Curated annotation (Swiss-Prot):
Protein keywords: DNA damage, DNA repair, DNA-binding, Glycosidase, Hydrolase, Lyase, Metal-binding, Multifunctional enzyme, Zinc, Zinc-finger
CDD domains on file: AcNei2_N
Lineage start: Bacteria, Bacillati, Actinomycetota, Actinomycetes, Mycobacteriales
Single GO term (MF): damaged DNA binding
Catalytic-site annotation from UniProt: 2 (schiff-base intermediate with dna), 3 (proton donor), 51 (proton donor), 245 (proton donor)
Organism: Mycobacterium tuberculosis (strain ATCC 25618 / H37Rv)
Name recorded for this polypeptide: Endonuclease 8 2
PROSITE patterns named among the record's database cross-references: FPG_CAT, ZF_FPG_1, ZF_FPG_2
Function (record text): Involved in base excision repair of DNA damaged by oxidation or by mutagenic agents. Acts as a DNA glycosylase that recognizes and removes damaged bases. Has AP (apurinic/apyrimidinic) lyase activity and introduces nicks in the DNA strand. Cleaves the DNA backbone by beta-delta elimination to generate a single-strand break at the site of the removed base with both 3'- and 5'-phosphates. Complements an E.coli nei nth double mutant.
Length: 255
């Protein structure tokens, strides 16, 4: 499940392979943009904003969102391409051709590079941005004090980058139920700072870890652990499905 850290890591990987290089192939397999060909353009930069990713050339910006199942694959040719590919980019890297393939992307569009900021203008503070603003994020969080905390954390207009995994993990380490109101959080500034710290330490990892134990099966506190013992107190982790999202919590550690 891609969240802000995954998108940040993906952007860093694409940047390393594409930035400063000329595109030798641009094959977009989305009907609306199938006629767009950026071959010959130089990739200036690749950036992320929350869960959004932008590949910028001189005139255009390739905007994508992974949503639930999307990914970008990078490698020397050939990188496997099948019916799930939404875009194929190639660029020369010294004497080798690099191929980048966007697979199962939830959103892919080509927009004016100089106006691409408009599509993310609604987002709250980006948890992984250099200009991260915890004061603004905390202020956004408490605007609706009766709102369930999980709902507020998942609202990208409040702060950008949190998905369901981090939402559940943050509720656990903060000792609050996902269904508790925002007003139950004693220190909103501390909560958003924890959110930033969680994503920051995971920004170079493909397998996120919130417990500090990177061994397989021990990386998360509650997410995906329904019916297993809480790592702190041993109480069985509970779960519920609301609005197509699964929520996990420890009945003893969270109130």
């Amino acid at each position: 499940m891609p969240e802000g850290d995954t998108v940040w890591h993906t952007a860093a990987t694409l940047r390393r392979h594409l930035a400063g290089r000329t595109l030798t192939r641009c094959d977009i397999r989305v009907p609306r943009f199938a006629a767009v060909d950026l071959t010959g353009e130089v990739v200036d930069e690749v950036i992320s904003r929350g869960k959004h990713l932008f590949i910028r050339t001189g005139t255009a910006s390739i905007h994508s969102h992974l949503q639930m199942d999307g990914s970008w694959r990078v490698g020397n040719r050939p990188v496997r391409v099948d019916h799930r590919a939404r875009i194929i980019l190639e660029a020369n890297q010294q004497e080798q051709a690099i191929r980048v393939v966007g697979v199962d992307l939830g959103l892919l569009e080509v927009i004016d590079r100089h106006n691409d900021g408009a599509v993310v203008a609604h987002l709250g503070p980006d948890l992984l941005a250099d200009d991260w603003d915890p004061q603004r994020a905390a202020a956004n969080l408490i605007v609706a004090p009766d709102r369930p905390i999980a709902e507020a954390l998942l609202d990208q207009r409040v702060l950008a980058g949190i998905g369901n995994v981090y939402c559940n993990e943050l509720c656990f380490v903060s000792g609050v139920l996902p269904t508790a109101p925002v007003s139950a959080v004693a220190d909103p500034r501390r909560l958003v700072t924890r959110a930033r710290d969680m994503l920051w330490v995971n920004r170079f990892r493909w397998n996120r870890c919130t417990t500090g134990d990177t061994r397989a099966g021990r990386r998360l506190w509650v997410y995906g652990r329904a019916g297993q013992g809480c790592r702190r107190c041993g109480t069985l982790i509970a779960y519920d499905t609301t609005d197509e999202r699964v929520r996990y919590w420890c009945p003893a550690c969270q109130r």
